[in-house]
Swiss-Prot record:
It comes from Haemophilus ducreyi (strain 35000HP / ATCC 700724). One of its GO terms (cellular component) is cytosol. Belongs to the Fmt family. Gene3D superfamilies: Formyl transferase, C-terminal domain, Formyl transferase, N-terminal domain. NCBIfam families: fmt (TIGR00460). Keywords: Protein biosynthesis, Transferase. GO terms for molecular function: methionyl-tRNA formyltransferase activity. This is Methionyl-tRNA formyltransferase. It catalyses: L-methionyl-tRNA(fMet) + (6R)-10-formyltetrahydrofolate = N-formyl-L-methionyl-tRNA(fMet) + (6S)-5,6,7,8-tetrahydrofolate + H(+). PANTHER family: METHIONYL-TRNA FORMYLTRANSFERASE, METHIONYL-TRNA FORMYLTRANSFERASE, MITOCHONDRIAL. Its EC number is 2.1.2.9. Attaches a formyl group to the free amino group of methionyl-tRNA(fMet). The formyl group appears to play a dual role in the initiator identity of N-formylmethionyl-tRNA by promoting its recognition by IF2 and preventing the misappropriation of this tRNA by the elongation apparatus.
Amino acid sequence: MSKLNIIFAGTPEFAAQHLQALLASQHNIVAVYTQPDKPAGRGKKLQASPVKQLALQHNIPVYQPKSLRNPQAQAELNALNGDVMVVVAYGLILPEAVLHIPRYGCLNVHGSLLPRWRGAAPIQRAIWAGDQETGVTIMQMDAGLDTGDMLHKVSTKIEADETSASLYMKLAKLAPPALLAVLDGLTEQQFKPEKQDNQLANYAEKLSKQEAKLDWNLPAYQLAQNIRAFNPWPMSFLTVEVEGVEQHVKVYQATVLAHQYHAVGTVLQVDKNGIQIATSEGVLNITQLQPQGKKPMSVQDFLNGRANWFSLGKKL
């Protein structure tokens, strides 16, 4: 096992947890690449990414180019003499020229069992599609979008109540040891590259706020999957008219019930156990929700003072 000089590229907390694991290893982090500071909070002050904050705590040089396509940025990277570049949720596209700069190329930690769910939102789309399991893939990057050779996979079950938030945390614990195993065996080529089967590939499109609105023409099981997949962002929501004003209500938890046919979007039952709404297939029973300007709450708490919002027979 040889000590490697690693260039790390990542931005969010998920990436920072990988950097933390690398800092605790025998390997040497020669530099960190992360996205430029962005305005955040009510004051819109520039805020450093979690990866940058961690790197500065450990006195690691930080680079924040807006792009890696220009020759100057590539020359800077080349001068670092890295053995390998580790890329985790960086957010910038790496041009092909960059992929060949480090001695062992660029490794990527991807949040799915490739070739399933290539693309921007693999964790969320696995839940959205009703997958029973997912995991992480450590891959050798190439010029395509998550199309490189796979070096190592680790899988985990997707629980029935799993949200993207909980799965994100699960993979953040699962992935760093898998990455370290690959790095520790890199010089001896302990992990043999495996080609991806393009016929099994699908694409994890980015989530949108428009997609988060609950569509009662979808089956109840799909809406329940959406609610879990879109938590913590963009959060599934419904709209309901109350005294002539359209109210937006975020939905945090729901279960699926069977039913005989009813007109879609009809409120069928309202009690402390849930708000039951007819869909094209089955009933969605909403059990936790959040009115605008309030915290998430149980149906029982929601109905205190809002009992008229979801009257029986009301069409949403």
